[in-house]
Amino acid sequence: MNLSKFKRYPLTFGPSPITPLKRLSEHLGGKVELYAKREDCNSGLAFGGNKTRKLEYLVPEAIDGGYDTLVSIGGIQSNQTRQVAAVAAHLGMKCVLVQENWVNYSDALYDRVGNIEMSRIMGADVRLDSAGFDIGIRPSWEKAMADVEESGGKPFPIPAGCSEHPYGGLGFVRFADEVRQQEEELGFKFDYIVVCSVTGSTHAGMLVGFAADGRAQRVIGIDASAKPEKTRAQVLRIAQNTAKLVELGREITAEDVVLDTRYAYPEYGLPNDGTLEAIRLCARLEGVLTDPVYEGKSMHGMIDMVRNGEFPEGSKVLYAHLGGVPALNAYSFLFKDG
């Protein structure tokens, strides 16, 4: 596997830390050891997160190509767009963000706080759009790029989740390399890796990275899209492309994509009771915050799997904490009583 041939622009502090979730593990019976790799604190750029890791492999193209405006898209409380705005500010570029109405959640402050507030503070041109949720290429995003061109700018396209970019999966191939180095220091290997999966490139890159040591099917994606067949197909497609790019040396097949579909309901961006219980439990036992859209759902999945005995006794499970905490402010009503 060859990742070194790709240019990388450092945006993170270095390897994100791996920390034990001792109290959560004990609360769940102590038969499974839980750990977290903290992508939620991987960078000093506006709280960082998994997209910051991905952008390290997209930014060189933007710089080398003389682009002056980063153009991206997400929901109103998109973590992606906040991280793109931060990177644009860091690089001295302009930023245009399309924020679509992906979540059926009504709150007077939803489009004024959290991620979107930070993007505005960082100087991004934020454009609200009424279109609903989907994980594909969006007309509103294409229009934003055309607008930049018409005004004399040179737009660099960054799709939702970085996922449709050919290099969108590279950052999480590197994640797997980091984990292997950290495993040497820890003196053991993780039996399973749990990750939230929506637009696909985080899961796909991780799958390819761990396929290098035979653990592709030990990467358990927790669907949060509530459109699992679209997500599954996108993970597979991105993983196959990424495997070729890094010269993995073997084909990625549909059997390599493990996607648990039990925890996304009722729909994208809306938590269920299990999501909220997982958010509170992890916060109160570990002081680790997760959000209702992504990490609360993957945390719910991991907790439920431990409770159900789905991990063999003695397993060491790594939870990939991808970020997302700034969105909590937009859901403050749900937590008004704690």
Curated annotation (Swiss-Prot):
Cofactor(s) listed: pyridoxal 5'-phosphate
N6-(pyridoxal phosphate)lysine: modified positions: K51
Pfam families: PALP (PF00291)
UniProt cross-references to InterPro entries, sorted A to Z: ACCD_DCysDesulf, ACP_carboxylate_deaminase, ACP_carboxylate_deaminase_bac, TrpB-like_PALP, TrpB-like_PALP_sf
UniProt protein name: 1-aminocyclopropane-1-carboxylate deaminase
Functional description taken from the UniProt entry: Catalyzes a cyclopropane ring-opening reaction, the irreversible conversion of 1-aminocyclopropane-1-carboxylate (ACC) to ammonia and alpha-ketobutyrate. Allows growth on ACC as a nitrogen source.
Assembly description: Homotrimer.
Classification lineage: Bacteria, Pseudomonadati, Pseudomonadota, Gammaproteobacteria, Pseudomonadales
Coiled coil: none
Highest taxon above the source species: Bacteria
NCBIfam families, A to Z: ACC_deam
Keywords: Hydrolase, Pyridoxal phosphate
Reaction catalyzed: 1-aminocyclopropane-1-carboxylate + H2O = 2-oxobutanoate + NH4(+)
Protein encoded by which gene: acdS
GO terms (BP aspect): 1-aminocyclopropane-1-carboxylate metabolic process; amine catabolic process
Example GO molecular function: 1-aminocyclopropane-1-carboxylate deaminase activity
Enzyme Commission number: 3.5.99.7
Active site: S78 (nucleophile)
Enzyme class label: hydrolase
Similarity section: Belongs to the ACC deaminase/D-cysteine desulfhydrase family.
